[in-house]
């Protein structure tokens, strides 16, 4: 998985008094965090959880569906990025199923938080670690949440033998390395905006909801990624407007110099003789 277990790495931590469940708490949440205040739980990137956290299937479904919606509206590669989200959900399930937990440093990398932004997370992890273990495994039923599924992808049965694998160069989970965000920007693939397919004539009206769609590389009807194209057009328009304004200001400045020079060379009012007969 993402991180090796303490036993594999040879690390050891003393258990905290009364921490009969979590014997490696310092590896997971560090030192005991101080009491949380209103600012910690309401502002900043780390204000997404509080101690006493429980699994709410309805909230989980709505949150994941919201991310699917963001992908459908803004991604240039809807199918590929939807698979990324599904892999994330599966990997976190497997971490719990195989009893592997991220270290605090691993949490910071996964959630992209600074050490000063992990107060709520650390307090929540510490509280959960001191809960008594559940007696037996349980199952979560699908909640009855009335929402429109945003992952609008079709099942193509006759794909002509096309490769259905990802083309993003994904690496196996056991060799994943955390990289700087600046290094990620060098990969131009994430900034590809796919054009609408001219061959796709199917209507895209899932569940009676009309909307534009295009057929992606996997042959699936997905919402047309128009937002990135609009963003590019707005950026180009802003760049053109900025260039035009700069050019106008430059011309105005040059014209102002000529105007001052002409005004200086022009005859004064008292030097101009009055008209004849005045």
From Swiss-Prot:
It is found in: Host cytoplasm; Host nucleus; Virion tegument. The keyword Transcription applies. Keywords: Early protein, Eukaryotic host gene expression shutoff by virus, Eukaryotic host transcription shutoff by virus, Host cytoplasm, Host gene expression shutoff by virus, Host nucleus, Host-virus interaction, Inhibition of eukaryotic host transcription initiation by virus, Inhibition of host RNA polymerase II by virus, Transcription, Transcription regulation, Virion, Virion tegument. GO terms for biological process: regulation of gene expression; symbiont-mediated suppression of host gene expression; symbiont-mediated suppression of host mRNA transcription via inhibition of RNA polymerase II activity; symbiont-mediated suppression of host-directed shutoff of host translation. GO terms for cellular component: host cell cytoplasm; host cell nucleus; viral tegument. InterPro entries: IE68 (IPR003403). Residues 155-169, 183-205 have a biased composition (Acidic residues). It comes from the Viruses. Residues 1-142 are annotated as: IE62-binding. Residues 1-42, 154-229 are annotated as: Disordered. The keyword Transferase does not apply. Its main location: host cell. Phosphorylated in vitro by host and by protein kinase ORF47. It holds the Pfam family Herpes_IE68. Interacts with IE62; this interaction modulates the function of IE62. Interacts with several components of host pre-initiation complex including GTF2E1, GTF2H2 and POLR2A; these interactions lead to repression of gene transcription. Interacts with host ASF1A; altering its ability to bind histones. Belongs to the herpesviridae ICP22 family. Immediate early (EI) protein that functions as a transcriptional regulator of cellular and viral mRNAs mainly by interacting with several general transcription factors thereby disorganizing the preinitiation complex at certain promoters. May additionally help to regulate levels of histones in virus-infected cells by interacting with host ASF1. By inhibiting host transcriptional program, IE63 plays a major role in the ability of VZV to overcome the innate immune response to the virus. This is Transcriptional regulator ICP22 homolog. It comes from Varicella-zoster virus (strain Dumas) (HHV-3).
């Amino acid at each position: 998985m993402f991180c090796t277990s303490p036993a594999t790495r040879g690390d050891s931590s003393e258990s905290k008094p009364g921490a009969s469940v979590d014997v490696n708490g310092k590896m997971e949440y560090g030192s005991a965090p101080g009491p949380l205040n209103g600012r910690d739980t309401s502002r900043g990137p780390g204000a997404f959880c509080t101690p006493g956290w429980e699994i709410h299937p309805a909230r989980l479904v709505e949150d994941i569906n919201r991310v699917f919606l963001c992908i459908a509206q803004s991604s240039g590669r809807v199918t590929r990025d939807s698979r990324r989200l599904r892999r994330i959900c599966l990997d976190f399930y497997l971490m719990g199923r195989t009893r592997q937990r991220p270290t605090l440093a691993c949490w910071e990398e996964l959630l992209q938080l600074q050490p000063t932004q992990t107060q709520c997370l650390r307090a929540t992890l510490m509280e959960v670690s001191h809960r008594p273990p559940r007696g037996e495994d349980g199952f979560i039923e699908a909640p009855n949440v009335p929402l429109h599924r945003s992952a609008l992808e079709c099942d193509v049965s006759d794909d002509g033998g096309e490769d259905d694998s990802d083309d993003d160069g994904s690496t196996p989970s056991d060799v994943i390395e955390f990289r700087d965000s600046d290094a990620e920007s060098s990969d131009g693939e994430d900034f590809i905006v796919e054009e609408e397919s001219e061959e796709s004539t199917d209507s895209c009206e899932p569940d009676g909801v009309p909307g534009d769609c295009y057929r992606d590389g996997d042959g699936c009807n997905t919402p047309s990624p128009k937002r990135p194209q609009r963003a590019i057009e707005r950026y180009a328009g802003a760049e053109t407007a900025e260039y035009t304004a700069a050019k106008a200001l430059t011309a105005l400045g040059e014209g102002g110099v000529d105007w001052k020079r002409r005004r200086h060379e022009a005859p004064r009012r008292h030097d101009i003789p009055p008209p004849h007969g005045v």
